[in-house]
């Protein structure tokens, strides 16, 4: 269950990240956390079993990329339990966020969150990345610990164009993966992230297509 300590940790952590949550956004994020805790027992949505670790390792980790979000149409590839896409949809109600995952249990959970939190700007897509064909390119494509940079860009290149930004959330800075980037992608910028309550390194890599 969600406790007052979880609520306080979320408020304090968001402020440390420079994010001013509205009361409604704070409530929605905690409602999402409650669903994640409940469904994780049966659906194995995340390897993090301890609810006391979920605020920092899931909610605040997802919120840490908010300052880097530009544009209005985003897709979270390999979304799993909905991170970071669901927190993004809560923070950017005027935008459109798609969650893509090939695991039916995980997309069922995502759909339940969409319904219970009334996230009309959230779309859930049950598909493999390479099989999904968007009607128009996305402004941004994001993944969190999804795959290597080579696979991430290779499986999603058809979802974007030269104006799209690919955001890869990583732990250690993946120097070896950058060497293997496809020739038509380049590293636009890299950012070391500090996530309140999280130990270890966190990095955000922003990639672009050159053609």
Swiss-Prot record:
S-adenosyl-L-methionine binds at residues 78, 83, 129-130, 144. InterPro entries: rRNA_ssu_MeTfrase_G, SAM-dependent_MTases_sf. It catalyses: guanosine(527) in 16S rRNA + S-adenosyl-L-methionine = N(7)-methylguanosine(527) in 16S rRNA + S-adenosyl-L-homocysteine. Its main location: cytoplasm. It comes from Pseudomonas savastanoi pv. phaseolicola (strain 1448A / Race 6) (Pseudomonas syringae pv. phaseolicola (strain 1448A / Race 6)). Belongs to the methyltransferase superfamily. RNA methyltransferase RsmG family. Gene3D superfamilies: Vaccinia Virus protein VP39. The keyword Signal does not apply. Specifically methylates the N7 position of guanine in position 527 of 16S rRNA. It is found in: Cytoplasm. It is an enzyme of class 2 (transferase). One of its GO terms (molecular function) is rRNA (guanine-N7-)-methyltransferase activity. This is Ribosomal RNA small subunit methyltransferase G. Keywords: Cytoplasm, Methyltransferase, rRNA processing, S-adenosyl-L-methionine, Transferase. Its EC number is 2.1.1.170. It comes from the Bacteria. One of its GO terms (cellular component) is cytosol.
């Amino acid at each position: 269950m969600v406790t007052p300590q979880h609520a306080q940790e979320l408020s304090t952590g968001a402020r440390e990240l420079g994010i001013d949550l509205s009361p409604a956004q704070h409530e929605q994020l905690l409602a999402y956390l409650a669903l994640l805790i409940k469904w994780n027992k049966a659906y194995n949505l995340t390897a993090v079993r301890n609810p006391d670790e979920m605020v920092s390792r899931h909610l605040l980790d997802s919120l840490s990329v908010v300052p880097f979000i530009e544009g209005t149409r985003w897709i979270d590839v390999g979304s799993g339990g909905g991170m970071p896409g669901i927190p993004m949809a809560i923070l950017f109600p005027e935008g459109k966020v798609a969650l893509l995952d090939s695991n039916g249990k995980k997309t069922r959970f995502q759909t339940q969150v969409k319904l219970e939190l009334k996230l009309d700007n959230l779309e859930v897509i049950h598909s493999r990345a390479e099989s999904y064909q968007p009607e128009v390119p996305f402004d941004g494509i994001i993944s969190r610990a999804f795959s290597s940079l080579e696979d991430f860009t290779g499986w999603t290149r058809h979802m974007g164009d030269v104006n799209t930004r690919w955001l890869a959330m990583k732990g250690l800075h993946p120097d070896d993966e950058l060497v293997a980037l496809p020739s038509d992608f380049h590293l636009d910028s890299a950012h070391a992230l500090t996530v309140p309550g999280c130990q270890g390194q966190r990095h955000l890599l922003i990639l672009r297509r050159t053609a």
